[in-house]
A protein has these predicted regions:
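N-terminal secretory signal peptides that target proteins for export/translocation
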Residues: 1-6
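Bacterial N-terminal signal peptides
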Residues: 10-23
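Bacterial Sec signal peptide processing site at the extreme N-terminus
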Residues: 20-41, 51-53
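A structured, mid-to-C-terminal "fold-capping" secondary-structure block
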Residues: 26, 139-265
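Membrane interface segments of multi-pass transport proteins and intramembrane proteases
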Residues: 52-69
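Beta-rich strand-turn-strand
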Residues: 74-76
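Mid-length scaffold segments of soluble, non-membrane domains
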Residues: 79, 86-157
Length: 265
């Protein structure tokens, strides 16, 4: 079994296990994170893997490649991601936006040399962020409990299902040649991780409890993406509400040098 197949099967197994076997985990007081005991354990595991393997590779990657090259790599993968954005824009009935995103993809794939240069943004075509988790939210499916996925990081029950669906619109995952697929996948993961190196320093200074900080930031961002930055009706807002917790009442996070990165596969 190759790397991408192993990761895909591992994610499926993790989601199924979480959906069927975790109801008995120790509960905390936050209704949006009833699996907090389990999630903190996975968070600590992810952080350990990141500290031992991914972060050093990302640091070396940034040290070797100049900023202009890293920007080009990021643009390349962002352009491929527009395929997922277009599909989910259509599924959310955002036809004008999806048309604009299709224009972005065509322009950057041609004039922008396979996306290495973000020509479309210079021409006024805005970059959007859409995925199947947001599509489910658009059609009224609640986020469900917060979830930390092994290796993949912050998620929710809805977004975990959406992540699996997004595999089928991910251009990298559809490449038949295993060597190219794995090379591109690995490069994307490392490039994404390198972009978090500066952010994590701010997190370590600002957050008393890294786990709670990452969780709340993730949930707030996902609500904003589903809402497209607008307020929803009171019932929907209440469904995704995350009450503030006093820092003193939160259990200490597992010692770590950085939060586990959220990497889009």
């Amino acid at each position: 079994m190759n790397l991408t197949q192993a990761l895909k099967h591992g994610l499926i197994a993790a989601v199924l296990a979480l959906l069927t076997g975790l109801s008995g985990c120790a509960h905390y007081n936050n209704p949006r994170d009833p699996l907090e005991s389990f999630n903190r354990g996975v968070y600590a595991f992810n952080d350990g893997v990141d500290t031992a393997i991914l972060k050093p590779i990302a640091q070396g990657y940034r040290a070797v490649l100049p900023q202009v090259v890293r920007t080009g790599v990021g643009n390349f993968f962002s352009n491929l991601d527009d395929v997922t954005v277009i599909v989910n824009g259509v599924l959310q009935l955002k036809i004008p936006q999806a048309t604009s995103d299709l224009g972005r993809f065509l322009i950057n794939s041609t004039i922008g040399l396979l996306g290495l240069f973000d020509v479309a943004t210079e021409l006024g075509l805005e970059k959007h962020n859409e995925d199947f988790g947001q599509t489910l939210g658009y059609w009224g499916i609640g986020s469900g409990p917060y979830l930390v996925l092994p290796l993949f990081g912050p998620s929710s029950f809805r977004d975990a299902i959406g992540r699996f669906a997004d595999f089928y619109t991910d251009v990298v995952w559809q490449i038949n040649d295993m060597r190219w697929r794995n090379a591109l996948y690995g490069t994307r993961v490392v490039n994404n991780r390198s972009r978090l190196l500066d952010t994590e320093e701010v997190l370590k200074i600002a957050a008393i409890d890294e786990y709670s900080f990452v969780r709340d930031a993730y949930l707030q961002r996902r609500r904003s993406l589903v809402d497209d930055g607008r307020r929803r009706d009171a019932a929907a807002a209440e469904e995704d509400y995350v009450p503030d917790e006093p820092a003193a009442s939160a259990p200490a996070a597992a010692p770590a040098s950085a939060p586990a990165p959220q990497v889009r596969p």
